[in-house]
From Swiss-Prot:
Signal sequence, renumbered to the chain: none
Family designation: Belongs to the methyltransferase superfamily. RsmH family.
The gene coding this protein: rsmH
Catalytic activity: cytidine(1402) in 16S rRNA + S-adenosyl-L-methionine = N(4)-methylcytidine(1402) in 16S rRNA + S-adenosyl-L-homocysteine + H(+)
Phylogenetic placement of the source organism: Bacteria, Bacillati, Actinomycetota, Actinomycetes, Propionibacteriales
Name of the protein in question: Ribosomal RNA small subunit methyltransferase H
Summary of the function given for this chain in its UniProt record: Specifically methylates the N4 position of cytidine in position 1402 (C1402) of 16S rRNA.
Entry's Gene Ontology BP terms: rRNA base methylation
InterPro entries from the UniProt entry: RsmH, SAM-dep_MeTrfase_MraW_recog, SAM-dependent_MTases_sf
GO molecular function list: rRNA (cytosine-N4-)-methyltransferase activity
Highest taxon in the source lineage: Bacteria
Keyword Ribonucleoprotein: no
Location within or outside the cell: Cytoplasm
Pfam families: Methyltransf_5
Record EC number: 2.1.1.199
Amino acid sequence: MLMATDAIGSDAVHIPVMRARILDLLAVVLKSGRRVHVDGTLGMGGHAEAVLRRFPDVELVGIDRDQQALTMAEARLEPFADRVHLVHAVHDELPEVLDDLGLDYVDSVLLDLGLSSFQIDEVERGFSYSVDSPLDMRMDQSSGRTAAQILNESDPGALVRMLREYGEEKFADRIVRAIVTERDRQPIETSGRLVEIITEAIPATVRRKRHSHPAKRTFQALRIAVNREMETLPAVLPRALDRLDVGGRIAVLSYHSLEDRPVKEAFRDACADTAPAGLPMVPESMAAKFNPVTRGAERPDADEVATNPRSASARLRVIERVRPGPVNRQHATKESR
């Protein structure tokens, strides 16, 4: 893990999703005293800046795997430098980050699982199917396999599973056959070429009926695989819950069902008691350690969606620790096997 150093400027614009609602939900714990807030997906620092401005006594721990976004956030948060700790790490390294800072517990945690506008629009990243660019898709460009390497080197069966599991793509077999045919001729290196392959593989009648871009599901699956998102998310949730102090809150923004499902399950387990069925009363030691704050998942209102269309699919879940002790990890345990 490396501390952020070189600050750089940027003209990129990123509108933090559900910013006002998140601030209101965290205000209960952050409004008084020297509190510690963790932004485990700092990005360009939009949510973090809002927290620091509204709560002048809050100390921020900002974590991100994307060094370029992290340095942009460092420049943005310079006015609050005496209250900010920025760390280059993946969010599932949260316990190690806090240990290095000498923090046993924190008061709030925010995880925004979406890409920033900067990442989507950055030509050299390859996240977007609307711009022709090198197929990279790594949030941390200093390590890991690129999307091009996965496409060109993976077994066809593994690619089919990836598209089905991470993209929920019905035409995974057809798309992978087309990918294999093309890569046998020459490596697939750019997003533009991949979009052409996908578009040609999906029947025209289906393309006309789909409300989204034909490449959307494949690009989502590739991004998830490149960044191991379905490994790090189930790992960070119980670790973040463990480090929340009593009265602390955790807020998670997800953008599709694959992200929302493990969040929903982890939060449901954390808010459940561990007493056997049939007991006339739940012993205090078995009582739920967390309570829900939001009723299910909240969505952005119509005004926000109109202003920031990329927020349309967002789902916000928040729970609060009400008792000390380990949480019920039924689903977290399953994911880690």
